[in-house]
């Protein structure tokens, strides 16, 4: 072979792979205006001692089953708008006439915001204003919140330790109490909770005809083993702990933010036991707050980061695997070897096909704050973090339509494919962790996200 021929071979062998030709483009984030008025001025430093005393008096009266109006008047007279966070906390528990109306008026007096006109509740617009303003709380606010919240659920006390990574301003009650049942306990919570489903039996796909082909499942694949979790069961339990392949998984489903995720619960330092995920009954900007039953460590459900407790101190971030939202019929075609959770969940329960009905038809029912206007609030997207750290959002309907038309969708070295009729993301080394969520949820955790557009 001539020297020229050798050189040509080397050049060709070392040439970079061609950049894939992807359809569409990405919309970058920009600053956007909100409908909220200017925030009220707030002082620095501690609360006035008189206001602190009035807060204490009001809390004592609530603990005793009353509501001391004079103490509320004294709080308003103090004129410190930072206390609006505490008033909003109380508005979650006192709604409608009586104390609820008094709290709404007090909030309006301190902040200048109008929140009483909302036909559903003054609580939601009140917190939305505070989030939009990013109004600071005072040092000690979390402990006052602790005094109120532990009246409702004493087990929440373990979450309110000092020096945690929880922004307590954003945490609110989700309307249920803590699920603290031991792993494998199938008894209902005596005081009401969202009960996790632990190690449910599964059946082969050809025995899963009890679930309609056009209904949604959340599909997970580990070690080439595929499992379908029916959406109607996930809407009831919102948390499943099980083993798939060689891995132990905790799979939360936040119905309020449209997001099912799968965490490797053995991905903790060796001094800790396998994490057992449970639903706390609390929310943060409409996203469920989950925790580890063994250590009472709070986790960020969207990121898997431990925010408190021993796992928070160890800076644990649980590893994730992808979850695909697909119809059952199409998932079976793509994964004929898939299994599906048994019809009764292994607990003898009958599940309605649509347990939540039209609950979310009118938008988020809990505070979320301002939402990036690039997409509608509850548009479903598949979110993924690119290899260069850039967050990406692929609107589900538009992306699926483009792929069905035979075009390619992706970003740099990532490509989106159909999986069933859901979406998965694949990189140079195989599948990349991705999951579906409502736009408001993905964008509030990843405000710098790029949005794909056809």
Regions found by a protein language model. Give the residues of each.
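C-terminal motif of bacterial Sec signal peptides marking the signal peptidase cleavage site
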Residues: 11-13
């Amino acid at each position: 072979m001539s020297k020229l021929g050798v050189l040509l071979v080397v050049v060709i062998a070392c040439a970079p792979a061609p950049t894939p030709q992807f359809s569409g483009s990405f919309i970058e984030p920009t600053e956007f205006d909100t409908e909220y008025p200017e925030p009220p001025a707030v002082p620095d430093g501690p609360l006035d001692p008189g206001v602190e005393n009035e807060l204490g008096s009001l809390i004592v009266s609530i603990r005793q089953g009353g509501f001391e109006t004079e103490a509320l008047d004294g709080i308003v007279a103090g004129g410190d708008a930072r206390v609006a966070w505490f008033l909003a906390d109380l508005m979650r528990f006192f709604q409608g006439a009586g104390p609820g109306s008094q709290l709404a008026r007090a909030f309006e007096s301190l902040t200048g915001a109008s929140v009483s006109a909302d036909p559903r509740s003054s609580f939601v617009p009140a917190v939305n204003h505070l989030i939009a303003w990013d109004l600071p709380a005072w040092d000690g606010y979390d402990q006052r919140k602790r005094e109120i919240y532990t009246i409702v659920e004493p087990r929440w006390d373990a979450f309110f330790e000092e020096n945690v990574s929880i922004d307590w301003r954003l945490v609110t009650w989700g309307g249920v109490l803590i699920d603290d049942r031991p792993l494998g306990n199938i008894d209902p919570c005596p005081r009401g909770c969202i009960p996790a489903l632990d190690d449910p039996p599964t059946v082969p796909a050809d025995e899963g005809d009890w679930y309609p082909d056009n209904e949604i499942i959340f599909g997970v694949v580990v070690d080439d083993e595929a499992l379908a979790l029916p959406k109607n069961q996930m809407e009831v339990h919102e948390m499943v702990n099980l083993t798939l392949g060689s891995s132990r998984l905790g799979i939360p489903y936040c119905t309020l933010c449209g997001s099912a995720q799968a965490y490797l619960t053995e991905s903790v330092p060796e001094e800790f036991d396998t994490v057992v995920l449970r639903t706390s009954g609390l929310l943060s900007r409409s996203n469920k707050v989950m925790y580890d039953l063994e250590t009472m460590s709070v986790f960020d459900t969207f990121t898997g980061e431990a925010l408190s407790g021993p796992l928070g101190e160890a800076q644990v971030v649980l590893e994730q695997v992808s979850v695909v939202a697909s119809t059952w019929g199409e998932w079976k075609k793509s994964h004929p070897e898939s299994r599906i959770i048994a019809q009764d969940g292994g607990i003898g329960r009958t599940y309605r096909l649509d347990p939540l009905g039209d609950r979310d038809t009118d938008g988020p029912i809990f505070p979320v704050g301002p939402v990036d206007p690039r997409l509608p609030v509850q548009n479903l997207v598949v979110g993924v973090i690119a290899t260069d750290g850039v967050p990406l959002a692929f609107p589900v309907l538009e992306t699926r339509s483009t792929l069905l038309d035979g075009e390619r969708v992706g970003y740099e070295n990532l490509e989106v494919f159909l999986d069933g009729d859901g979406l998965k993301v694949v990189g140079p080394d195989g599948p990349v962790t991705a999951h579906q969520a409502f736009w408001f949820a993905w964008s509030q955790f990843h405000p710098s996200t790029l949005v794909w557009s056809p």
